[in-house]
UniProtKB/Swiss-Prot annotation:
InterPro entries: Kintoun (IPR034727), PIH1/Kintoun_subfamily (IPR050734), PIH1_N (IPR012981), PIH1D1/2/3_CS-like (IPR041442). Residues 658-671 have a biased composition (Polar residues). This is Protein kintoun. The keyword Cytoplasm applies.
Length: 843
């Protein structure tokens, strides 16, 4: 037993131990070696132990204390009987029940039990306690000794009455536990054949004297310095309430025990492998230590060890122990060992812990490697259940399935088992925050916007009109989040909608569900969706797409004859190309034309475009291919059969037109192809091969230029290449694709002896020449007149200019020969002058 445990229940602390120096120790050693000193020392010991000398010592102490106004009584314990038990389940202790005539005699009174009304005797038993002391038992083992002193009459009654003896023992045990704050083993009390354990030591009871002496009555010189002392009175003895009901004494005592985790140092756990630290928290062995201070050997007890528990039983009188303990890990009960320390009365049990096998470790390693893949870094919610709970739920589900299979009997009576729920009760599921639905023919597609979905976690339950699916995602912390989605088609649809096949695909950012409906069912217009069948909401189907065959009406309209009309104006020429409508369509076309014309006139009056805006209107932004498709669908939905009516109003520009030698080639042939030249007023002018357009069909928009004399000379320009199955010419004009090539090659030559400043001057000179050429080009005075005349001409043309510039300019001159303001020679002269300016700029 260690020194700490020895002094645990002693009033002596480490700082109260004998502390001597080396010099003092050597002096004591030298003195004890002297025979004369030893003789004197033994004489002193005999004098102290002599009862006559002790009586003289007590009288002197009593007289000295009486002079101080304190009455002192020495109590000498007389042997009675001894009680043996254990202290806190780990140390043997002895309680001496002694007697002394200095203690007040016990007395009783008649009392009534308040619980049942029975009459009995209530005993008043005075007692006194001495300080605890350390001692040794018969085998020289450490033990603890307590003295409890009663009046001799109390011990006399205890010898004659067993119930009073038990009451006296319980009173002594309660006094020791209350005074020293310890726990005594009441189930294993022994009464050895001893009258007293150890050597009796007297104790002192002090109290103030009732009759003060003459010296105390004399005033003290320091009496006025200190505050007035409180009046002295005899304190009443401390009375502890008697127990009306005895505490139940257990038949067996639960011994003290401890479980220690033993772990070896394994260098393989300090590597960077994924499975290196799988068993860091799992110990190698479990060491169970049980304190049995009242047992001499383990032959007197029974020990049973299983894979998950330890059971100990001792039925020896005076050492009754019983312990049933559950182990925190599964152990190998056949490979354990036990050892009993007779000195410490301690039983040590070593049990090896069972670890997972190699296949289980390999499966766990694969699972960790699957979880450790890189994700997209999207943070997910952490309010789902843990993987351990999920595994436990799976185990419970498998056990329930096994129990169900075992209860099935081969009798003819059918056994109806409850259906297993699709969603696990121990797992918290979430509904995807966002999902879309589209329908194409008999295919209904759902897009669930959930990222990082594990493909192997997708499970589905398909019925005739419903589908239930669940899946899980793994976030950056390897923590799963479970989702569920339930969709149900309404049963009141005409013709019904039955699900024949389901396909689920997991992508990086979403999950795509494809529901293949039966061929007889119609496309649903709404559906019910939610987490499960008990929580559903109704949603409409937004996107419905059907593949329709090409109608014959469109083919008839393409082959219909065209009606071409020319409207002459001072500044422009309006060409209208329309198919010959039927009698029923003429009224609708006229009404739409009148309404649109009124809207454009009103818009033109409210807003007058400035010069910069009129210049910007020449250029039009082309639409993307997807935007064109959306516009076509909206136009088809609003006007199923729009009339093929196009109005092209082009401003006067200085352009090149076809010469007279090309009249025959232009006017002949149904399908015409031409290479047209179109340049801006202020931009550079490319060559004839820079731009080209080809037309193979009459379904596109037409833009013609006819001279004022009505001759056969005209130029045709087509706004763009019409796309397949498109009857809207204006839309194909905005969606045309143009490829331009420039045959001018820019060459820059640097001389080795030239400086950067000289090159800068050369560039500045070239810019000055170009700016001078532009100013010379605008010095004719026709640019301002051209802008003003063009602005007056654009006002009545609200239909073509205020509609968002839906038509591109084909680049063909429609005004050069129509109004008669200039001749062919004037246009050719201006164009020749422009080309000469370009050549000067290039050189």
């Amino acid at each position: 037993m260690s020194a700490g445990s020895r002094n645990k229940h002693s009033k002596f602390r480490n700082d109260d131990q004998l502390d001597i120096s080396k010099e003092e120790f050597s002096r004591i050693k030298e003195a004890l070696g002297n025979e004369e000193f030893r003789k004197l020392f033994f004489d002193y010991v005999d004098e102290i132990q002599d009862p006559a000398n002790r009586k003289i010592y007590e009288e002197e102490i009593t007289q000295l204390e009486k002079e101080r106004g304190v009455e002192v009584r020495f109590i000498h314990p007389q042997p009675g009987f001894v009680v043996k038990t254990s202290l806190d389940g780990e140390l043997k202790c002895f309680i001496n029940i002694a007697s002394s005539p200095e203690i007040e005699a016990p007395h009783n009174e008649v009392a009534t039990n308040p619980e049942n009304g029975n009459r009995g005797l209530s005993w008043y038993i005075p007692m006194a306690q001495t300080s605890s002391r350390d001692d040794a038992d018969a085998k020289n083992n450490h033990c603890k000794v307590f003295d409890v002193v009663f009046h001799p009459d109390a011990l006399h009654l205890a010898k004659r009455n067993s119930q009073f003896r038990k009451c006296l023992v319980d009173t002594a045990l309660d006094a020791v536990e209350r005074e020293y704050q310890v726990s005594l083993d009441r189930a294993n009390l022994k009464f050895p054949k001893l009258d007293y354990k150890g050597i009796a030591r007297p104790t002192v009871i002090r109290k103030l004297a009732e009759n003060p002496t003459a010296e105390q009555l004399e005033p003290h010189p320091l009496q006025n310095i200190y505050p007035t002392a409180p009046p002295t009175s005899n304190p009443e003895p401390r009375v502890h309430p008697m127990k009306t009901k005895a505490a139940p004494v257990p038949e067996f005592t639960i011994p003290r025990y401890s479980i220690k985790h033993s772990h070896d140092v394994d260098l393989s756990e300090y590597t960077d492998e994924l499975d290196a630290k799988l068993h860091v928290t799992v110990p190698r062995n479990l060491v169970v230590e049980i304190e049995l201070p009242l047992l001499r050997s383990t032959a007197e007890c029974q020990l049973d060890v299983t894979s998950k528990s330890v059971y100990l039983l001792s039925e020896k009188p005076g050492a009754k122990y019983r312990l049933k303990m559950d182990l925190p890990f599964t152990v190998d009960d056949k490979a354990g060992s036990a050892r009993f320390d007779t000195d410490l009365r301690r039983l040590s049990i070593t049990l090896p812990v069972v670890r997972s096998s190699v296949p289980q470790q390999r499966d766990m390693h694969d699972t960790l490697r699957h979880f450790s893949r890189e994700d997209s870094g999207v943070e997910l919610h952490s309010n789902s259940e843990s993987p351990v709970e999920e595994e436990e739920a799976d185990a419970d589900l498998s056990d329930s399935k096994a129990d169900t299979s075992e209860t099935v009997t081969p009798t003819a009576t059918p056994v109806h088992s409850a259906p297993t729920p699709f969603l696990k009760k121990s797992v918290h599921y979430q509904l995807p925050a966002k999902f879309d639905c589209n329908v194409l023919d008999n295919v209904m597609a759902f897009v669930l916007h959930v990222a990082n979905v594990q493909p192997d976690s997708i499970e589905q339950l398909r019925e005739q009109r419903s589908l239930h699916i669940q899946f899980a995602t793994i976030g950056s912390g390897y923590y799963p989040t479970h989702y569920a989605f339930y969709v149900e088609l309404p049963a009141d649809e005409e013709g019904g909608s039955a699900i024949e096949n389901v396909e689920a695909e997991a992508w990086d950012n979403n999950v795509v569900l494809k529901l293949c409906l039966s061929s007889q069912s119609k496309s649903p217009i709404r559906y019910m969706a939610g987490l499960d069948a008990t929580d559903l909401n109704e949603y409409p189907v937004h996107g419905q797409y059907t593949v329709k065959p090409k109608r014959r009406d469109a083919q008839n309209k393409e082959s219909a004859p065209l009606d071409v009309k020319f409207d002459h104006n001072k500044e422009s020429l309006e060409v209208t190309i329309r198919p010959v409508p039927s009698a029923t369509e003429e009224d609708e076309v006229e009404e739409q034309h009148e309404e649109s014309h009124e809207e454009h006139q009103q818009h033109a009056q409210n807003k007058k475009p400035s010069k910069k805006q009129r210049k910007r209107n020449k250029k039009e932004r082309s639409l993307s291919e997807s935007a064109c498709e959306d516009i076509v669908q909206e136009q088809h939905a609003e006007n199923p059969a729009p009339p093929a009516k196009n109005f092209l109003k082009l401003p006067q520009r200085k352009q090149r037109s076809y010469s007279e030698c090309n009249d025959s080639s232009v006017g002949s042939g149904a399908s015409q192809r031409g290479i047209l030249k179109r340049f801006s007023r202020y931009g550079p002018r490319p060559s004839m091969s820079d731009s080209c357009s080809s037309i193979d069909d009459y379904s596109s928009s037409y833009s013609c230029s006819v001279d004022a004399s009505g001759a056969s000379l005209f130029s045709q320009s087509f706004g763009g290449i019409p796309e397949e199955d498109r009857s809207d010419a204006g839309l194909s004009e905005s969606c045309k694709k143009t490829v331009r090539f420039n045959d001018h090659i820019t060459k820059q030559v640097f001389r080795l002896d030239s400086s950067i400043l000289g090159q800068r001057k050369k560039n500045q000179k070239r810019r000055d020449l170009k700016l001078r050429a532009q100013q010379r080009r605008l010095s004719e005075g026709d640019s301002v007149d051209y802008e003003e005349s063009r602005g007056d001409a654009l006002k009545p043309q609200g239909k073509a200019s205020n509609k968002g510039n839906k038509l591109h300019d084909s680049g063909l001159d429609l005004t050069g020969t129509a109004a008669g303001h200039g001749s062919h020679s004037d246009a050719d002269a201006k164009n020749a002058m422009m080309f000469e300016m370009d050549e000067d700029d290039v050189m």
